[in-house]
Swiss-Prot record:
Highest rank taxon of the organism: Bacteria
Record's GO cellular component terms: cytosol
Gene giving rise to this polypeptide: purM
Predominant cellular place of this UniProt entry's protein: cytoplasm
Record key words, sorted: ATP-binding, Cytoplasm, Ligase, Nucleotide-binding, Purine biosynthesis
Protein EC: 6.3.3.1
GO biological process: 'de novo' IMP biosynthetic process; adenine biosynthetic process
Subcellular location(s) per record: Cytoplasm
Protein name, as recorded: Phosphoribosylformylglycinamidine cyclo-ligase
PANTHER family reported in the protein's UniProt record: TRIFUNCTIONAL PURINE BIOSYNTHETIC PROTEIN ADENOSINE-3, TRIFUNCTIONAL PURINE BIOSYNTHETIC PROTEIN ADENOSINE-3-RELATED
Family: Belongs to the AIR synthase family.
A single GO molecular function term of this UniProt record: phosphoribosylformylglycinamidine cyclo-ligase activity
């Protein structure tokens, strides 16, 4: 008996590393020292910093993985993984330098897992950081067939004097919301429960009544087919495709805006807990934010979730990003220039509120 008899194929692991080397190489930066395969990844700090501060972040993509696995579509979930980490690091004003991933599965499926790594590499390219290394763990008996889990780790850098920590935020500063691409990577346990309870049974009934075989999968429905206010491409999008839309990565447009002269007093990544939980994290003591929820459009997926699952509006805002994936706090006299900048960078931006006196709350939301 050997390790392979126990369910761990060492040669398959070696072959997998060789498959992904070219993907990793596409993300390299000049500061990377050495290649893939060492015991540790080495990275030389960029020059020009007087008091460099390293900023770290770790995250996953939650049960969005279940949808990717159900649809056998693995090429974008890696982008989500990178986005969740680099957007967090960005809120401190830091430039992401490098990224590491942890991928665990019961059995190595080379095609699917190569797609996952390709997505991670694409996310790193979007963020401008190097995929410095990672770990692929084959653990037979630990995960069901076809399932895997992901975790990501990112390190960024910022000048100490330029680090954002809430102390720069002033009363009267304005909140600028950067549009999300959809649900991003939070709230999927609620989404899956809604699909299981309300859409799955209906799809099965239609299939049993002689409808197309595709309707066996609730992810194939097109909830927006009758929405004449939407472009044709959106009306034709399936539920599964909408839910697998990758999380927006805000690193390059935000850092470029900052380097072009925009003053940023604070930033918030809108993840689990939505605006009410995440926006106060970038404020100072005695501050709240007054928002106008009518000042930005929400992607149609949120209307569908709310109506199909009878989810109260307050609960929607407490769970999802509701169309705003990242928030910037800027001085009032820079709002217009900031909006112009982001809207010319294919990063839709909206003036959504103002910093007011308070106890760390988000005011103005329904409920």
């Amino acid at each position: 008996m050997d390790y392979r008899d126990a369910g761990v194929d060492i040669q398959a692991g070696r072959d997998f590393v060789n498959r992904i080397k070219a993907l990793v190489q596409q993300t390299t930066r000049s500061e990377v020292l050495g290649g893939l395969g060492g015991f540790g990844g080495c990275f030389q700090l960029p020059e020009g910093y007087r008091q460099p501060v390293l900023v770290s972040g770790a995250d996953g993509v939650g049960t969005k993985l279940k949808i990717a696995q159900a649809l056998n579509q693995h090429h974008t979930i890696g982008i989500d993984l990178v986005a969740m980490c680099v957007n967090d690091v960005l809120t401190c004003g830091a430039e992401p330098l490098f990224f590491l991933d942890y991928l665990a599965t019961g059995h190595l499926e080379p095609e699917a897992l190569t797609d996952v790594i390709a997505g991670i590499a694409q996310g790193c390219q979007q963020a401008g950081c190097a995929l410095l290394g990672g770990e692929t763990a084959e653990m037979p008996g630990f995960y069901p067939v076809g399932e895997y889990d992901l975790a990501g780790f990112c390190v960024g850098i910022v000048e100490k004097a330029e680090m954002l920590n809430g102390s720069q935020v002033r009363m009267g500063d304005r909140a600028i919301g950067l549009a999300s691409s959809g649900v991003h990577s939070n709230g999927y346990s609620l989404v899956r429960k809604i699909v299981d309870e309300f859409i799955g049974p209906a799809a099965r009934e239609q299939s049993e009544a002689g409808a197309t075989e595709a309707l066996v999968s609730p992810w194939s429905i097109t909830p927006w087919a009758e929405r004449e206010d939407l472009p044709p491409v959106d009306r034709q999008q399936s539920l599964g495709a909408a839910l697998l839309t990758p999380t927006q990565i805000y690193v390059k447009p935000v850092l470029a805006a900052q380097r072009s002269g925009l003053t940023l007093h604070g930033m918030a990544h809108i993840t689990g807990g939505g605006l009410p939980e995440n926006l106060p994290r970038c404020l100072g003591e005695g501050q709240s934010v007054q928002l106008d929820p009518q000042s930005w459009p929400a992607p149609p997926i949120f209307d569908w979730i709310a109506s199909t699952g009878s989810v109260p509006t307050a609960a929607m805002f407490d769970t999802f990003n509701m169309g705003i994936g990242f928030v910037l706090i800027v001085p009032p006299d820079e709002v217009e220039s900031a909006l112009r900048w982001f809207n010319t960078q294919q990063c839709p931006a909206y003036g959504i509120g103002e910093v007011v006196a308070g106890a760390g709350e988000v005011l103005g939301l329904p409920g």
